[in-house]
Amino acid sequence: METLVLSNILHFESGEDEYLFHGLTGNILKLDDVAKEFVHFAKELGDRTGDSFHVDASRYLDGRAADHRDMLEELMQLEIVNPAGRFSATPLAPKQTEKLPVKTLVFHLVNECNLRCTYCYAGDGEYGAPKKYMTMETADRAIEFLMENSFQEESVTIVLFGGEPFLNWKVLKHIVERAVEQGEKWGKKVHFSLTTNGTLMTTEQMQFLHKYQIGTSVSMDGTRVAHDKNRPMAGGQGSYERVSKNVAQLVATHKSAPVGTRVTVAKGFEKLETSLAHLLSKGFYEVGFAPVTETDQDLALGIEDLNELLRQFRELSDRYVEHALRNEYLGFSNLTNVLKELHMGTNKAYGCGAGLGFFAVSPDGGLFLCHRFNENEQFRMGDIYSGVDRNKQRQMLDELHVDRKESCATCSLKHICSGGCYYEAMERQGDYRRPNAHYCDWMHQWITIGLQVYVRILEGNPAFLDTISGTGKERCVSN
């Protein structure tokens, strides 16, 4: 046998068992004694590059029984082991972008906000541009653009965003009603989601969200002290009291779609268990924790902060398993998202859908790579009048493809992470095309936790994974 490559693997333990996660195929293998022996041999005596190991197969098989050769052949069939120089296929960058449908459009209803959050990437909601409000005429054209450019897609998604979208309530209401009308005309189901700071919602607006089944995310940072620390009103006073009061009414009124919350985690963050318990007690369906992207040293998470965040993520993950084995859902959405990707065998060539089927539309109709790049001319991708700049889209997708990121080539997370967020890469690495190297070690540890949780739930209550993923089928761990 020739030199073989045990490629893109994450070797982990759960209880007394050992497993392999293969980052190119998404396969998860429970290792028997023969496979364990090979993996340990590869890690100890093979030539390592990233998460891949070159192994002299003849040396390994010398003196070993036939079942070791059978095991290698099985791993080769699964493409976890390959002859040197050959790897499992990666989804290619699209060559004919004209055929790519637009599936999701983020509507920036207004470049303005009534809060002054310390960590806001949008610069008080203005994105470095003059204050702008989307008009009904622009909204109508954006809806028409989405219908036309979604091609044969049976459903599309509209994200209602800002700034603070409720500052432009009349247009928000018009967008939803008009999109539903146009969806019926075009034979498409329109899904809606909305992100808000929660300070301005009225009873009428909450009833509207319920009527149109609008998935709603309220930005809230935990208890009063934690929230008011970084999310003051424009006048300087805390916003917690107003948000808390509105959330209580919102979750009582809006029953047709999940109401979740997003916590921005900055330096000096509140204990996550405290934040999670507090926010779930408010009636939120689930809570997501997002490390701040701000590079200011007073806000950014350092290595010690990230390690502490990971430690607390592990604690919450253990609680999540306890609930899942009782067939209960603990609304820790960071872990839910990882479990969904593992269960569905996610194989991403890009960090996200930005520029593929996902765009942001500015108040005046410009199309941008995503909502974080709103009003940034470098990332203008056309407009709703002349359409997507397909040449720029093709160039951008070629540049952003994970195979362009050399340091990702042998990584076990190649098709889960795919280099991460483009905006954060620009902020932290100075180049949107580079992988988020500052999070690599952290991501490996976090996904390892996710894998350990996954196999525990799969063995104890596999139906739970089907439920949260909406797959209707069980994705098994191979023995």
For each of these PLM feature ranges, what is it?
Residues D398-I449:
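Cysteine-cluster motifs in flexible loop/terminal segments that predominantly coordinate metals
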Residues E308-E341, H371-S418:
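C-terminal accessory region of radical SAM enzymes
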Residues F38, D47-L61:
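Short acidic, hydrophobic short linear motifs in intrinsically disordered regions
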Residues A139, I143-V159, N168-V292:
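Radical SAM/AdoMet-radical enzyme domain recognition
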Residues I143-F161, M396-L400, R434-N479:
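Short Fe-S-cluster ligation motifs
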Residues Y121-E126, S256, S412-I416, M426:
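Detector for the c-type heme attachment site
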Residues G63, D67-D70, E74, L78, ...:
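Conserved alpha-helical substructure of the radical SAM core
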Residues M1-K43, G472:
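Acidic, low-complexity/disordered tracts enriched in E/D and polar residues
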